[in-house]
Amino acid sequence: MSQNESGTIAIPMYDKDDAVLVLEDGQVYVGEPYGALGETTGEIVFATGMTGYQETLTDPSYDRQIVVQTFPHIGDTGVNSEDPESSRIWVAGYIVRDPSPNVSNWRAEGSLDDDLTKNGIVGLSHIDTRKLVRHLRSAGVMRAGIFSGDALTDQATGALKTIEQLLEDVRNTPQMQGLSLYDEVSTKETYTIEPCGEYEGKEPLYTVAAVDLGIKGMTPHRMAERGCRVHVVPSTITFAEIESLNPDGVFFSNGPGDPEQAGPEIELLRQVLDAGYPFFGICFGNQLLGRALGFGTFKLKFGHRGINQPVKDLTTGKVEVTAHNHGFAVDAPIGKQVDAPFENGKYGKVFVSHIDLNDDVVEGLQCVDIPAFSVQYHPEAAAGPHDAAYLFDRFCELMKNNSKEGK
């Protein structure tokens, strides 16, 4: 959508059977409804994976976000009960170029369209997603809304709503920067994942307290595969409650929202570090470690979201293809060890261990003097490549060494 010479919004043609996407900067895309009819607003972002759409939809880190798939053809393999990463769909809305009219996969239990409809997820299809993504890369992610069905009608007059009316709804949506969302997606009660695979039925090698800030289901499973008993605990847990679990290590998960607004979790993490527990953080957990150490965080222009992001391990020189979902990053110096800024270097030396090769964004932190490290990306690989699975082994090794030395 463009503006005319007078500066007013140029209104595209649409009717009550269409679905309309409105961006906060005034751009409008008219397509077809996909999934449920209605209205949804949130931060519009794009994901670059060719596969793994079911894992994307159920990732709690996408809370309050409208997701655009850059790959044009989505839905071929349908949906099943094995691939979700949580108990529900978390995206606020979903946009695809060309949804598959047929499902063709031996594991499929239904269609993506039906699943979105059943779960009340408002979506849109048959727009130029390439044009949309190019705009988001240029202008940055922003607030947006999808409107279809009765949401396009002014209930007072019975007429179609104007773009100005829809735009007002979009601009009344909270900005992602400044939002605290992890309590919204966290489990309310502790649950436990026992060792599995070759360790099934055996005594656990290690006990992990995993703080759920929006955890994906595959993450504790990756630890359980390595002989860990994983207590997944609510974000509201206290340090005393963590200690009562007698963990060998503590894990902070991925999650949505602005890390600057996670003050209680940052203080909890500092208590964990002060007590000498081995610590591993992923995604939001990486950002919280950064802030606990005294570094800042900032919002990326359009973020990293997809299962094909190149990351370089600066300690080995190896490049990994990794899965990402983050719109914020840690502001830390690259290429040297520095004193962690918090309380004049209380936590000793730290260095950036990984960077994204597309934009040099910090993708990992390694503490030198305390048993703590984190990565910004997703080594659990759900969906995505398994290049970074070694990080779970590193966490186990950290717990093993810490046990020998005595915490």
Curated annotation (Swiss-Prot):
InterPro entries reported in the protein's UniProt record: Anth_synth/Amidotransfase, CarbamoylP_synth_ssu, CarbamoylP_synth_ssu_N, CarbP_synth_ssu_N_sf, Class_I_gatase-like, CPSase_GATase1, GATASE
Annotated region (CPSase), positions in chain: 1-203
Lineage: Bacteria, Bacillati, Actinomycetota, Actinomycetes, Bifidobacteriales
Catalysed reactions, semicolon-separated: hydrogencarbonate + L-glutamine + 2 ATP + H2O = carbamoyl phosphate + L-glutamate + 2 ADP + phosphate + 2 H(+)
Active site: C283, H378, E380
Binding site for L-glutamine: S61, G255, G257, F284, Q287, N325, G327, F328
Listed pathway(s): Amino-acid biosynthesis; L-arginine biosynthesis; carbamoyl phosphate from bicarbonate: step 1/1; Pyrimidine metabolism; UMP biosynthesis via de novo pathway; (S)-dihydroorotate from bicarbonate: step 1/3
Gene name linked to the record: carA
Family: Belongs to the CarA family.
Keyword set includes ATP-binding: yes
Protein EC: 6.3.5.5
Cystine crosslinks: none
Keywords per UniProt: Amino-acid biosynthesis, Arginine biosynthesis, ATP-binding, Glutamine amidotransferase, Ligase, Nucleotide-binding, Pyrimidine biosynthesis
Residues in Glutamine amidotransferase type-1 domain copies: 207-405
Record text on subunit structure and interactions: Composed of two chains; the small (or glutamine) chain promotes the hydrolysis of glutamine to ammonia, which is used by the large (or ammonia) chain to synthesize carbamoyl phosphate. Tetramer of heterodimers (alpha,beta)4.
SMART domains the record matches: CPSase_sm_chain (SM01097)
Annotated PANTHER family: CARBAMOYL-PHOSPHATE SYNTHASE SMALL CHAIN (PTHR43418:SF7), MULTIFUNCTIONAL TRYPTOPHAN BIOSYNTHESIS PROTEIN-RELATED (PTHR43418)
Protein name: Carbamoyl phosphate synthase small chain
Function: Small subunit of the glutamine-dependent carbamoyl phosphate synthetase (CPSase). CPSase catalyzes the formation of carbamoyl phosphate from the ammonia moiety of glutamine, carbonate, and phosphate donated by ATP, constituting the first step of 2 biosynthetic pathways, one leading to arginine and/or urea and the other to pyrimidine nucleotides. The small subunit (glutamine amidotransferase) binds and cleaves glutamine to supply the large subunit with the substrate ammonia.
